[in-house]
């Protein structure tokens, strides 16, 4: 009986991990897609994509949100905090990519999230122990990320101050992402359906983000290219991607989930090479291989540590 339960937990973990990796593929397309917009502020790109994507998620989860409204009300403070973090995330993330480059902005934002997640769990969690295997896989992934970031050639040369500010914004994005995912996981663990938790957070985040388009949304729909990119990013990476991530959080601990998201900068870098025309050196490819090893280690873990 114990073996059956263990096998079931492992299968659930691997299904959740696969959903998170699929979400990473969708998220990894955002930097390349955004690079083709014409005269559009990164603030507008982030606000529209996350805002409209959030509204779509809320509509899809409307019945579940209504059914669990009392449970959600019990988490109102956490919901507000998570929604604020979710609103900050795309603004910091897309601006970071513009200032530091698509690859470096993505790498810093995503690679810092596992660090911040563990810190949050240590400060506010229930003493969840972090396994030696997690630290080993994180060290492998962090080394891979460092090699990839150092070997990548940005699309546009930036001044030193802009570059450093872009990296700082990437760290802000990583912290915001960690807060969102930790709150969502905490709600799911305490009985809130993943669709209700994610849908409610995104609905509140959308209410904070969409009004900013009145100030930043110039040229967002100035031509068919800008319009199609904006709609693609809202529907697929932001809506479908976060639905997949929410599903994955049912079966994967949040510190493991955020470590799996290191797959996103790999996807982003490969797309930048194949589509945008950037180059990756031998060290960069070695970094990608190390990140792959990190992902294999994480995807084979049991559902509970």
PLM regions with names:
Residues 32-40, 98, 149-163, 213-230, ...:
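Membrane-interface helix termini and inter-helical loops of multi-pass transporters
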Residues 14-19, 44-60, 135-143, 165-172, ...:
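Hydrophobic alpha-helical transmembrane segments of multi-pass integral membrane proteins
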Residues 1-53, 84, 88-92, 156-186:
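Glycine-/small-residue-enriched transmembrane alpha-helix faces in small-molecule transporters
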Residues 60-64, 113-136, 266-286:
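C-terminal transmembrane-helix exit sites in multi-pass transporters
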Residues 48, 105-112, 183-206, 238-274:
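Helix-helix packing/entry segments at the starts of transmembrane helices
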Residues 57, 131-152, 271, 283-302:
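Hydrophobic transmembrane alpha-helices of multi-pass small-molecule transport proteins
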Residues 62-105, 109, 146-147, 234-252:
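Specific transmembrane alpha-helical segments of multi-pass solute transporters/efflux pumps
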Residues 37, 45, 96, 123-126, ...:
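Hydrophobic/aromatic residues within transmembrane alpha-helices
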